[in-house]
Amino acid sequence: MNINVANLLNGNYILLLFVVLALGLCLGKLRLGSIQLGNAIGVLVVSLLLGQQHFAINTEALNLGFMLFIFCVGVEAGPNFFSIFFRDGKNYLMLALVMVGSAMILALGLGKLFGWDIGLTAGMLAGSMTSTPVLVGAGDTLRHTMANGSSLQQAQDNLSLGYALTYLIGLVSLILGARYLPKLQHQDLPTSAQQIARERGLDTDSQRKVYLPVIRAYRVGPELVAWADGKNLRELGIYRQTGCYIERIRRNGILANPDGDAVLQVGDEISLVGYPDAHSRLDPSFRNGKEVFDRDLLDMRIVTEEIVVKNSNAVGKRLSHLKLTDHGCFLNRVIRSQIEMPIDDNVVLNKGDVLQVSGDARRVKSVAEKIGFISIHSQVTDLLAFCSFFILGLMIGLITFQFSNFSFGIGNAAGLLLAGIMLGFLRANHPTFGYIPQGALNMVKEFGLMVFMAGVGLSAGGGINSSLGAVGGQMLISGLIVSLVPVVICFVFGAYVLRMNRALLFGAIMGARTCAPAMDIISDTARSNIPALGYAGTYAIANVLLTLAGSLIVILWPGILG
């Protein structure tokens, strides 16, 4: 049996789509040195090559892909988005605005200088910033502002061409900038990180190991009573000295949970909870007593839960204010916008932050009720909330403002982004509403993006040869300028106007570019994960601003030409 592959793919849009995705994802795993091509550029390259052979898919698949992607971006940004505006995120907001604004101005200027159309200009901006939200926002606005016809098709083709030509330039130049720019400035990055650590009491170990606490039991002997010297448990401060706390005491056969006024007596049997290394630091007077194996004394169900910060008595407060150890709980991680933060007693908690806490199940539940709620570990998505807010986003996108002879529509990109932010924000405040497992959200977001990239590549592939010869060199130079110059502008603005600590500043710059590989390099250079504080500060707002920049550059383009 002979199978004509070309006819088979042309006659089956779904098969063609998944062939493009599979080949593109394989290509995306290739590495150039230490740099991985990535899924987005892999799918785009494969779709452009197949597009040259006149393969095409239904444009509705492209539209659905970008809608799913941009909605999920909003959902991820929602929990921490508003804290950027209403609290101590002013510097991070200003840095993100400077980064996105300067890049957009440079792109508009270079587009006019070289005589490009809006498709090439917006595509170059998206590729240079390695930002698919720019590409999505620009593509949606093009469809809403240009009449269907050859001009719209040409602009959409050039949009994907500009992105494909400049993406690797933007990624490689930013990674090299992250590696060498810190060495060109006067302040040493590790020293800056240590300065923040001293000021805030931070743990600078970026590879902090996390263990579950363990429980062991001892019989109190004369040496331990002598060491206690008649002090009660509160006065002894055993946790401050050892990192362990006394969970239970058996005295005269009676098992009880001690309070701070309890005084140890010879013959008591005590259970201590702490990390393994904390047990090894116990005073010898503990270990000289006989270790006991009492089923009831050791019967404690240690759990690890993720607690979402929500309540007013925790939001805006320092981590030390929670006094988790006083409640018999251990803090393992602090996560903000899916970014692991340093364990810092002085860090100010935002609504939507996630604290990973270990301890006795009852104690962890009690702490969760005080500061927020335990994140649901369900694999079931609240599809009703997902679909309802998706519809709301589409309805918002239909809103059009009329100013004399000029009309401006919000568009699907901005509408879905806003609806996604609303859903994410409400999810961070109501534990049973709108739950979407992170794995499911990542899958929908990534799949939507890949479908969108496949669609734009197949649409643009037919005209790539003629366009590449005309603008290839201009694109490469422009991509380098738009990638690096805003980074330098942000550094100067942050260092000499905002006077930010360099470790936080470089982290914030990489967050404004939403580039995780460059962030890893900054952390390695600083020999600390302290730059993650700055990265988390700008990341959420930058994703939103980049989407809006894609729409705004299309709206402003006619005025630039005029």
Curated annotation (Swiss-Prot):
List where in the cell it is found: Cell membrane
- What are the GO cellular component annotations? plasma membrane
Where do the TM regions start and end?
A: 8-28, 37-57, 66-86, 94-114, 118-138, 158-178, 383-403, 406-426, 447-467, 475-495, 541-561
Q: Which InterPro entries match?
A: AAE_transporter, RCK_C, RCK_C_sf, Transp_YbjL_put, YidE_YbjL
Q: What is its main location?
A: membrane
Q: Provide this UniProt record's keywords sorted from A to Z.
A: Cell membrane, Membrane, Repeat, Transmembrane, Transmembrane helix, Transport
Give the top-rank taxon of the lineage listed in the UniProt record for this protein.
Answer: Bacteria
Q: Report the Gene3D superfamilies cross-referenced here.
A: Regulator of K+ conductance, C-terminal domain
- Domain RCK C-terminal residue range list: 202-288, 290-373
A molecular function annotated in GO for this UniProt entry is: monoatomic cation transmembrane transporter activity
* A Pfam family the protein falls into: TrkA_C
Membrane topology, as annotated, equals:
Multi-pass membrane protein
Gene Ontology biological process: potassium ion transport
Q: Which PROSITE patterns match?
A: RCK_C
Q: Which family does it belong to?
A: Belongs to the AAE transporter (TC 2.A.81) family. YbjL subfamily.
Q: What is the name listed in the Swiss-Prot or TrEMBL entry for this protein? A: Putative transport protein YPO1326/y2857/YP_1266
Q: Which organism is it from?
A: Yersinia pestis
